């Protein structure tokens, strides 16, 4: 199986910024760490981290062919909590799929696994964000992960202490839900196939089958965040 990981923002766009970090930097860190674990189960590619996939999608100049992948995960950090002093509780983690996705087993497992490390689970939501919309339009299941809130002291305290564990949790959640086996295929090889004959009984792993479309996103960042995140919903500019 081939999986594409995309770090949100970059190429001059820092994303959300607070005293605890810059989104564009943390998304690059996360995709690289997720790849370290996930590469034991599948071929994992990174969208060029010096580029901005959202800007590329809007300009019609994406650096990859989504059709070459079995799953696409775009990584971001959320904002809007404006809890810079900390209130003793996290605002949490959430993940988005397009409105066309039929099942969300992979995404449910991802946020459950992150939440188990100390975050509130904000669940799986459906919004057509630009990059994942383009991936789904190419027939590929996709999701946009908001790891945690970059302007929440409690969130970022947990994240800073457990960032490598969070990345591993995301990778293992994907591998588990797709039924991937460690070392089962070499990088660049095709997933193992099995002939299905008439009358055969086929079991499909929950969460491993999808169908739909995807899009972009846009949201205003509070005063606590110095620069505005950019990714409008499909068909909008923000």
Segments (PLM) and residue ranges:
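Catalytic-core regions of hydrolytic enzymes
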Residues: 2-93, 98-99
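Active-site-adjacent mobile loop/cap segments within catalytic or ligand-binding domains
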Residues: 4-6, 15, 65-67, 72-81, ...
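Solvent-exposed loop/turn segments at secondary-structure junctions
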Residues: 10-12, 50-54, 77-83, 100-103, ...
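Long, well-ordered alpha-helical scaffolding segments within enzyme catalytic domains
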Residues: 29-39, 103-118, 155-183
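Surface-exposed patches in mature extracellular/periplasmic domains of secreted proteins
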Residues: 44-50, 121-127, 182-186
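Beta-loop motif signature
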Residues: 188-233
């Amino acid at each position: 199986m081939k999986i594409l990981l995309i770090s949100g923002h970059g190429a001059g766009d820092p994303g959300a910024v607070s005293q605890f970090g810059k989104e564009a930097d943390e998304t690059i860190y996360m995709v690289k760490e997720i790849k370290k674990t996930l590469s034991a189960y599948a071929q994992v590619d990174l969208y060029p981290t010096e580029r901005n996939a959202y800007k590329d999608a809007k300009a019609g100049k994406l650096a990859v062919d989504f059709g070459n992948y079995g799953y696409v995960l775009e990584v971001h950090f959320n904002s809007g909590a404006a809890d810079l002093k900390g209130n003793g509780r996290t605002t949490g983690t959430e993940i988005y799929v397009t409105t066309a996705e039929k099942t969300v087993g992979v995404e449910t497992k991802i946020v459950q696994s992150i939440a188990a490390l100390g975050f509130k689970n904000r669940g799986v939501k459906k919004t057509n964000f630009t990059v994942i919309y383009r991936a789904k339009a190419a027939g590929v299941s996709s999701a946009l992960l908001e790891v945690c809130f970059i302007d929440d002291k409690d969130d970022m305290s947990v994240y800073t202490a457990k960032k490598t564990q969070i990345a591993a949790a995301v990778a293992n959640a994907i591998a588990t839900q797709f039924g991937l086996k460690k070392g089962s295929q070499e990088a660049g090889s095709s997933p193992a196939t099995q002939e299905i004959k008439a009358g055969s009984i086929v079991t499909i792993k929950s969460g491993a089958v999808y169908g739909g479309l995807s899009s972009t996103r846009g949201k205003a960042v509070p005063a606590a965040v110095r620069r505005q995140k950019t990714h409008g919903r499909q068909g909008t500019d923000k």
